[in-house]
Amino acid sequence: MDSSLAISGGPRLSNREWPRWPQPGDRALKSLEDVLTSGRWTISCAYQGRDSYERQFASAFADYCGSAMCVPISTGTASLAIALEACGVGAGDEVIVPGLSWVASASAVLGINAVPVLVDVDPATYCLDPAATEAAITERTRAITVVHAYSAVADLDALLDIARRHGLPLIEDCAHAHGAGFRGRPVGAHGAAGVFSMQGSKLLTCGEGGALVTDDADVALRAEHLRADGRVVRREPVGVGEMELEETGRMMGSNACLSEFHAAVLLDQLELLDGQNARRTRAADHLTDRLSELGMTAQATAPGTTARAYYRYLVRLPDEVLAVAPVERFAHALTAELGFAVTQTHRPLNDNPLNRPSSRRRFATDARYLERVDPSRFDLPAAKRAHESVVSFSHEVLLAPLDAIDDIARAFRKVLDNVREVSR
């Protein structure tokens, strides 16, 4: 039997049809048809005599996150920017941002004319490093943002302690972590606010969407103003044909509302989330056991994690493998064997072509500001190391049966056995 690698013309190890994403539930189509005929396609349309899907989702997701309040928002990026402003961050303020993340972690800060301070990550969890965080705090720091990255929960014990001692709000970015938990409580409910993305690749998705959860009524009220052009949902009942949004004039905002279509899909997806997460965790645990036999190190999570949510499965290659084959070539070889995309981590934000504030005139307020927001001024050795040593794949693969997960382990073994072929 030909054992050469698929990238060299050999046979693929697996010809399976892997699970696709997103996966609609049973109620999605009926709910979307209901929105179409309801006469109300968004919260800013007139009240039609029943709770909107947006209001239903706000209530359901607040309950799911163990939070008092939820403000649905159009995207995860907008949710983060709104959370920062709602917590008092403004122009020129510094915000701690993890250096290994999607560009939105920085662009949301830039979007409110604040300054992203890129901080290195823990070398095992790839989440914000507490010691590096404390070292980066200055008299200009106004908030700490932490991403629960890929499949890990960050060290909230240490980060919350730092935030309290310095009098700073901690904002949890849970874009990868719908359903994860820390010390028995859902992520997003530990800091001043938690924000979520419901973009198409996420564990809970409606194509594009977001949300902010909080126990702080003042933060929630400011977030409502910021996402609805300075309007808030009326607290008193309204009649059919009346506007449910009230113009208060207390705080200027912009339009970042979530439509009824998106909210309807989210209610459908929320019913499926826990079951899907359980299947992913079972598959991830099985794969971690198999790959550990090959000398691979799976992404760790902080002590105190009580539930993991696998947005992406990450594993670090052994040093002796990396000495022979670059990580991008190893990932490419796995992709060829399995038929789904295996990639590196995000590129660190200090060396990421998507994170270039100088490419936009809106950030050219003055030369000093451009210097402060220049990402290349930060050193992120652990983030760089992760990008150069870790391979990853998306969560829907973990919804496959366990015999398919065994194929993944066999693909790793095949590439390892032919690693010098990968280096060509």
Curated annotation (Swiss-Prot):
InterPro entries in the cross-refs: DegT/StrS_aminotransferase, PyrdxlP-dep_Trfase, PyrdxlP-dep_Trfase_major, PyrdxlP-dep_Trfase_small
Keywords, comma-separated and alphabetical: Aminotransferase, Antibiotic biosynthesis, Pyridoxal phosphate, Transferase
Reactions it catalyzes: scyllo-inosose + L-glutamine = 1-amino-1-deoxy-scyllo-inositol + 2-oxoglutaramate
Signal peptide limits: none
Superkingdom of the source species: Bacteria
Region span, Disordered: 1-21
Cofactor(s) recorded in Swiss-Prot or TrEMBL: pyridoxal 5'-phosphate
CDD domains (UniProt xref): AHBA_syn
GO molecular function: glutamine-scyllo-inositol transaminase activity; pyridoxal phosphate binding
Family in the record: Belongs to the DegT/DnrJ/EryC1 family. L-glutamine:2-deoxy-scyllo-inosose/scyllo-inosose aminotransferase subfamily.
Subunit field text: Homodimer.
The protein, known as: L-glutamine:scyllo-inosose aminotransferase
Gene: stsC
